[in-house]
């Protein structure tokens, strides 16, 4: 028997049958979480064809994209289109017998935060959802990937998908993560190295001592943003940290079933002599806090660096892309990144809206105030995260520093709700995408870790968070 990667093992164990000689298989899907934005047409397709949902208990419907996050919760959406989406979503949940986490549900939140809170993500699973950041679940030793609306309809009706197998990429991250650096900095470093299409057609497996040292929530950040390099899957072999993290969550097995599951999950790893199609090596020794300066997550650099000079790029297409990015971002080639003034600071999203992220933010903000010209917004990834942050006293620190403390939702990660930036606004953001207009038409986004966002809010401009923290904190 030939050696296999973990990705290959997961796909093989879920393959119902081969469909051709080009790598297409019929794949069984264990779980899916759907939101109000990408699923309406899929349910309409079921209704038109008179089809039922094959296994309603394997799906969760969750409102997160269009709901307001202002402090006073309301079941009504401010946007009429958003209200139609939510109303139809509620109707679909009732008619097809699928559990719904509505806006006022104490379990509501961003789908990729809620799923693991509820124990819906288990090692060895294959999970598909109508959101590209479904790769997040690789942090648990599961294969997660995003799908389109027509695929959602097929999945609802059959519990399967036509899937094309990917090539494999091994990303080895060695060394100790430097002071004030995080998983966000690792993934931005990876993006800077391989580009926004460097993993297109691949499933990434992250390995190495730096990965083992990351918390489970840090691993989620890493896998979440792997899709920004084009990867349609990102996996980390599960270990004791993962097993301890998921133990006791609502949908997890208990008693003897838990022990049996542990035995199976402990075997989930790539074979020692497995061959990957591509390998990338990163040493954390010289890693510094990272920020993006452009309009793609791979247009990034260390906070101690400068905005690049397009004329130094020999590839004409890349040079044109640099010129376009600097024009949109209103930046001058050669300027120090730490001199870029901001108007907004946003912390949240499925990338960095978990309790560990908020603790890092509180460490920076405690005893400090944000700059008078900066509007700061913190949106917890779920209602459960919000409650925990309040119980730990973090929310008081945020409010005292001048941040708005909101309810859970996707919020300012994308301009799809009332949390939208205006043209010319510049935001330090703990999110995953800095595309043109991502946070609002004409708005400018700089991606970075939550701690870096907090530091920028205090300084009023991009700044090295290390200057605000003492080594060893």
From Swiss-Prot:
Entry similarity comment: Belongs to the aconitase/IPM isomerase family. LeuC type 1 subfamily.
Organism field: Salmonella choleraesuis (strain SC-B67)
The enzyme's E.C. designation: 4.2.1.33
Residues bound to [4Fe-4S] cluster: 350, 410, 413
HAMAP family linked: LeuC_type1
MF (Gene Ontology): 3-isopropylmalate dehydratase activity; 4 iron, 4 sulfur cluster binding; metal ion binding
Cofactor: [4Fe-4S] cluster
Keywords in alphabetical order: 4Fe-4S, Amino-acid biosynthesis, Branched-chain amino acid biosynthesis, Iron, Iron-sulfur, Leucine biosynthesis, Lyase, Metal-binding
Chain's role: Catalyzes the isomerization between 2-isopropylmalate and 3-isopropylmalate, via the formation of 2-isopropylmaleate.
EC main group: lyase
A Pfam family matched in the record: Aconitase
PROSITE patterns: ACONITASE_1 (PS00450), ACONITASE_2 (PS01244)
Protein name according to UniProt: 3-isopropylmalate dehydratase large subunit 2
């Amino acid at each position: 028997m030939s050696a296999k990667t973990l990705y290959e093992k997961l796909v093989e164990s879920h393959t119902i049958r081969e469909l051709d000689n080009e790598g297409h298989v019929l794949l069984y899907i264990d779980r899916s979480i759907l939101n109000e934005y990408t699923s309406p047409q899929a349910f309409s397709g079921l209704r038109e064809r008179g089809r039922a949902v094959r296994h309603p208990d394997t799906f969760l419907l969750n409102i997160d994209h269009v709901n307001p996050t202002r402090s006073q919760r309301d079941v009504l959406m401010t946007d009429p289109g958003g209200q139609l989406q939510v109303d139809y979503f509620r109707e679909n949940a009732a008619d097809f017998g699928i559990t719904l986490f509505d806006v006022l549900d104490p379990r509501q939140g961003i789908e990729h935060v809620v799923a693991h809170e509820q124990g819906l993500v288990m090692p060895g699973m294959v999970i598909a959802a109508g959101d590209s950041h479904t790769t997040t679940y690789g942090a648990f030793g599961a294969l997660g990937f995003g799908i389109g609306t027509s695929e959602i309809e097929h999945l609802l009706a059959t519990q399967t998908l036509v899937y094309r197998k990917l090539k494999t990429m091994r990303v080895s991250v060695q060394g100790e993560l430097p002071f004030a650096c995080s998983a966000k900095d690792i993934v931005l470093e990876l993006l800077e190295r391989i580009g926004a299409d460097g993993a297109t057609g691949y499933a990434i497996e992250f390995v190495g001592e730096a990965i083992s040292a990351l918390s489970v929530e840090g691993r989620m950040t890493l896998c979440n943003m792997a899709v920004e390099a084009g990867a349609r899957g990102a996996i980390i072999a599960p270990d004791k940290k993962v097993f301890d993290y998921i133990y006791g969550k609502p949908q997890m097995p208990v008693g003897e079933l838990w022990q049996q599951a542990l035995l199976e999950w402990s075997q989930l790893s790539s074979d020692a002599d497995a061959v990957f199609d591509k390998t990338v090596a990163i040493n954390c020794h010289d890693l510094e806090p990272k920020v993006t300066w452009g309009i793609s997550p791979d247009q990034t650099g260390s906070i101690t660096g400068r905005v690049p000079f397009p004329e130094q790029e020999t590839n004409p297409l890349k040079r044109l892309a640099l010129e376009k990015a600097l024009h949109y971002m209103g930046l001058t080639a050669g300027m120090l990144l730490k001199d870029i003034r901001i108007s907004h600071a946003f912390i949240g999203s499925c990338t960095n809206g978990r309790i560990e992220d908020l603790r890092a933010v509180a460490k920076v903000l405690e005893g400090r105030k944000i700059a008078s010209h900066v509007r700061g917004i913190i949106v917890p990834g779920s209602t459960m995260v919000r409650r925990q942050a309040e119980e730990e006293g973090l929310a008081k620190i945020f409010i005292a520093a001048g941040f708005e403390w909101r309810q859970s939702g996707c919020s300012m990660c994308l301009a799809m709700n009332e949390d939208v930036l205006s043209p010319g606004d510049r935001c330090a953001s703990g999110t995953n995408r800095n595309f043109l207009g991502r946070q609002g038409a004409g708005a400018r986004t700089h991606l970075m870790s939550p701690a870096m966002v907090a530091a920028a809010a205090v300084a009023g401009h991009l700044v090295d968070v290390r200057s605000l923290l003492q080594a060893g904190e």
